[in-house]
Amino acid sequence: LSTGLEVYKTDIANRVLKKQVILALGTNSSGYSNELLDEYVSSLPKGHQLILVTPYDGRSEGGVLAQREYELELAKKYDYVFVADWHQTAIENPQIWEGTDYVHFGSNSESIIEGGTLYANTIKQAIDEANSGNVKP
């Protein structure tokens, strides 16, 4: 998350952020902390929306689950923060994880396509919700 924050702040400084900022930085031991997520929210410029993609790591629930819960809390607290709940989609579709490391979906072309479609649709649903939602005042 900290490396992503550097890129995010550079994009803010260069004024290249789109209205909807999608943040998907929560896998492979991302260095999650509530404070870093708070910094993403507080740094978001006025007139923008933040879409947080919940992380999934089927090997353990520890930090990944805590990050997901905090992202859901942020979406309840701020009406310009939205959640693409990849974690929920991932656990509802165990077939995409068969024969994998439980971080990267798809052990064959069929399950790779299915996982990619599920991931994209999860984000699209959040974008659709944000399209009718508020921006940061």
PLM features per residue range, with description:
Residues 61-137:
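Catalytic His-Asp segment of secreted/periplasmic serine-dependent ester chemistry enzymes
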Residues 1-39, 58-65, 69:
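Conserved SGNH/GDSL esterase-like catalytic core that processes O-acyl groups on lipids
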Residues 19-25, 49-54, 82-85:
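Structural recognition of the beta-strand scaffold that forms the well-ordered cores
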Residues 38-42, 81-83:
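Short, functional N-terminal and low-complexity linear motifs
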Residues 44-47, 78:
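Acidic-histidine catalytic/liganding microenvironments
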Residues 18, 32, 45, 107-108:
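Alpha-helix initiation/capping motif
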